[in-house]
Amino acid sequence: MIYHEIYDVIVVGGGHAGTEAALAPARMGLKTLLLTHNVDTLGQMSCNPAIGGIGKGHLVKEIDAMGGLMAIAIDQAGIQFRTLNSSKGPAVRATRAQADRVLYRQAVRTALENQPNLDIFQQEVVDILVENNRAVGAVTKMGLTFKARSVVLTAGTFLAGKIHIGLDNYAGGRAGDPAATMLADRLRDLNLRVDRLKTGTPPRLDARTINFDVLAKQHGDAELPVMSFMGSVDLHPRQIPCHITHTNEQTHDLIRNSLDRSPMYTGIIEGIGPRYCPSIEDKVMRFSDRNSHQIYLEPEGLSTIEVYPNGISTSLPFDVQMGIVNSMKGLEKTRIIKPGYAIEYDYFDPRDLKPTLETKAIEGLFFAGQINGTTGYEEAAAQGLLAGINAALQVQGKEAWFPTRDLAYTGVLVDDLCTLGTKEPYRVFTSRAEYRLLLREDNADIRLTPIAHELGLIDDARWARFNQKMENIERERERLKQIWIHPQSEHLAVVNELVNSPLTREASGEDLLRRPEVTYDKLTQVAAFAPALDDKQAAEQVEISIKYQGYIEHQQNEIERHKRHENTLIPAEFDYDKVESLSNEVRAKLMQHRPVSIGQASRISGITPAAISILLVNLKKQGMLKRGEL
């Protein structure tokens, strides 16, 4: 049966990538359908109950700046908020929130159900319709066909998913959910490179059986941050602490003695796991010199007894998991509610994607999330947003859009994936960005909200608030420029208490704020520079933009130099075989990756500066040398 209505965009999957991918085109005015195997698990946190962190918090802010949902949802569901790296520079400061799983899922579902232009339908998808090399719809398990002008696939770990606990394994997309086996088989028939990855999750513990009295507490920040630029502390639910315990030699001995029952160490699992979130087995073996590892006991919500022991992800047998848990301080009598497990799943080589996340092989088919080789809710959501935007733009007949590396961490993420590919689950870090001083959490809206407005992703309220913030920043910077302190000023004594070396000549408020020891808050407590802005976001921008002005300008100059050829396009039909000066290795890599620009080509492993020069000369010779907006 063919459904009577033709959609502009169909999104398959209702996880973190799928929800953002569905909301974006709906906000842009396109008729959108979200297909999920279970509407009750929309926005489900399959692993750790947290959003944000180093690099990840930056992505969440970018999603929010573009009108996405994740930041708003966690502001309504976060039960502990912290600013990480708060003592370091603004480039690496990051917001992290512990989440109440139920509240988060409720926030996501409410947003989806109240979004105009978005329909939701519960059915497992078993096939993607492809006609004349273009995706035109999806087929569900009961034989119902939905037609569309573009399709976004966000299947997470469900494609041919296999769950491992000890030497036992079975098909599954995650605990309690079936694997998408039929869809995986169908996708393997398409002209796309497929491989396997692995991830894992720890056992869940019964809080009633944990001796919290002997454990160290970890509280959130006294001054609670918010994740969304439109957020408010008033949205946060009740805040509660986490607790900390540690593994010990007994724990490690048990793990070492059980490796013959580990699916990883016996070769049953073939997929590669996440480097930066290893299983406890991996940690014990890779860091054999350490006799202890810190484990965070994170509550899964305000209305549940489940606790997530962050740091003991494992696929060891259940009896070994019990031994691991009971070997740790405070957990001697703790019960396990859900066993930990590892899961293997299909993913597609992201080098087969355009930077818009459309597949190169099939027009109108977009991939987002873990099926592109990433790990993490935030990475998935950022991809979902980008894929949804471009699926919509394609239907509208408009030019595609994606952020560059100097504009957003989303740009770093996508460029790394599409240019270099990945053989292990990829996660974002601030260290992956060349221009991280420009890609801060605090300025994500300044970088991206005007673009979101042009694309039709944000409402009038957000746009008005953004413009008011920009006016506040400009007005305050100008005000501080105009206020001067002279050596004879009545305020000199107070100002000298703020600075490391007394003033010997006149200085403006801007001059003073450039000093490392002077903060905006301290400066505006001086009567001459009062009052401070009520708008805390604008005040933060004033301080950072003044204090780091020289460094920011230096990075912007670097970007301009780099951009001279970054955006030089390489036509899809460019024939590398005709470029005789290229080595066979370079030619083979360029033909394999098919970079869309000189900038992308330059980041492919093994592509030398000399090869880039040869490419530029040949593009010019063939009359193909042109720049594009990437």
From Swiss-Prot:
Keywords per UniProt: Cytoplasm, FAD, Flavoprotein, NAD, tRNA processing
Compartments where found: Cytoplasm
Binding site for FAD: G13, G14, G15, H16, A17, G18
Domain of life: Bacteria
The keyword Cytoplasm belongs to this UniProt entry's keyword annotation: yes
Cofactor(s) the protein requires to work: FAD
A GO molecular function held by the record: flavin adenine dinucleotide binding
Pfam family, one: GIDA_C_1st
SUPFAM superfamilies: FAD/NAD(P)-binding domain
Protein task: NAD-binding protein involved in the addition of a carboxymethylaminomethyl (cmnm) group at the wobble position (U34) of certain tRNAs, forming tRNA-cmnm(5)s(2)U34.
Stored NCBIfam families: mnmG_gidA
PANTHER family with a match to the protein in the record: GLUCOSE INHIBITED DIVISION PROTEIN A, PROTEIN MTO1 HOMOLOG, MITOCHONDRIAL
Protein's recorded name: tRNA uridine 5-carboxymethylaminomethyl modification enzyme MnmG
Organism the protein comes from: Actinobacillus pleuropneumoniae serotype 5b (strain L20)
Gene from which the chain derives: mnmG
